[in-house]
Amino acid sequence: MANRNPGCGAFCTRRQFLLAATGTAVAVTAPYFATARQRDASEDSDRILADAESRIRQHRMAPVTLKLVTPDGQPLGPGRRVEIRQVRHRFLFGCNIFMLGRCRTPEQNAAYESRFAGIFNYATLPFYWWNYERQKGSPDHERTEEIVRWCRAHDVTTKGHPLAWNYRDPPWLTGTPQEVARAQFERITRYVQRLRGDIDIWDVVNEATHYDRAECKRDAPRLTEAIAAMGVGPYIRTAFKTARQAGRDATLVINDYRTDAAFAEKVISELADEHARPMYDVIGIQSHMHGGPWGAARTWEVCERFAKFAKPLHFTETTLVSGPKSESGWTTTAKGEEQQARLASEFYTVLFSHPAVEAITWWDFSDQGAWQMAPAGFLRDDMSAKPIYERLCDMIKGRWWTRVEAESGPEGRLRIDGFQGEYEAAVKENGRRLGGRFSLAKATAEATDVQLTELSADR
């Protein structure tokens, strides 16, 4: 069947949808109305951005009164200068980590690692079935465990992507549609159980809205036929039920590139149990913008559309490129890098200001090995930092980061307002340097005890 139109009806391809979603394919037959729409969107974007910082303060910060307790159980004396330092965001700022240890040189690997750890607290690990298990029964768990160890050492939360996706069949996968579906669900059980405690956030089903697009039928005929035989609703419900049984405390994500009503109506609304309770924990929204930026107005509109489901939103795959595609290739440019930094800072500002959003994952960290060979990274091909890296560092670890000095009052109390996350407090008392940790969230008790212990000389 022919595709309907670039405005993305039910039969639009993934590529057409992404192009249409960026707003780059305006109707050339109606320039006046296109211009009017663009003008309205621009005005909306200006308003959304102008109000963003106040929303960020409202939704991302929290007040708390700390009661500092010394190692001998007594309140810290009044008038002590206390350093309060944030060490981790509650919000998940992340990226896929596919190139960890796989860059061309040891020096590039070191740069990749240090810069990743310098900005992100969240990493997406690859679980593409056709690549992860090239031979039946021989999954690449060794690679996963290597990445998990690195993430644990750098206090980076991990996510697996994806457990089920009919993008390409594993070469060895055979059988009836029922047997193929059974193999898929058994994979979910094995991986979630094996990696429990190492990876507890999962993209369970990826891109189910348009599972039967042409490239899926061509490259994943067996998996696609299995979904068709079951029906989309029963398939995704079985996948999520299987994942929940394997990991009771896991965070389960339904992920898609469709940001229109089709995702909401065809997939999310179908993903409920017999008691009409959602079977998912998070709605995952892809935001690849290879063809151009969404703009603040569209970004906010997407957030509002999916916030109505009353579940956290994760922007799971975000891309803005730093150079135009040409016949000679796709490379980064100085002008493109500045534009990428500006557009990314606006995109992150809008998302961080929306109360439903809890995570943003960039796709990919460096231009080396990037999807579509696009200049999409925070780092160039040689692992040097682009302006986007510095700009986002200034935001994530600067403007949206809390570090203050305060004076203790009676009973060792002091009050701060800070961005939600993990904190360290440090103070000198009777010649000793004392420190303690605490968490700050909207739900944090109004008065929170911080138990201080003596710090070593190097801290």
What are these regions (language model features)?
Residues 1-12, 25-27:
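N-terminal secretory signal peptides
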Residues 108-118, 415-422:
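Short Pro-Gly-centered beta-turn/loop motif in secreted/extracellular proteins
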Residues 122-135, 145-250:
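Substrate-binding cleft and catalytic face of glycoside hydrolase catalytic domains
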Residues 146, 152, 226-254, 262-329, ...:
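Glycoside hydrolase catalytic-domain groove-lining segments
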Residues 203, 208-229, 235, 242, ...:
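Aromatic-rich peripheral "rim/lid" segments of glycoside hydrolase catalytic domains that contact
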Residues 421-431:
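A short, solvent-exposed beta-strand micro-motif common in secreted/extracellular proteins
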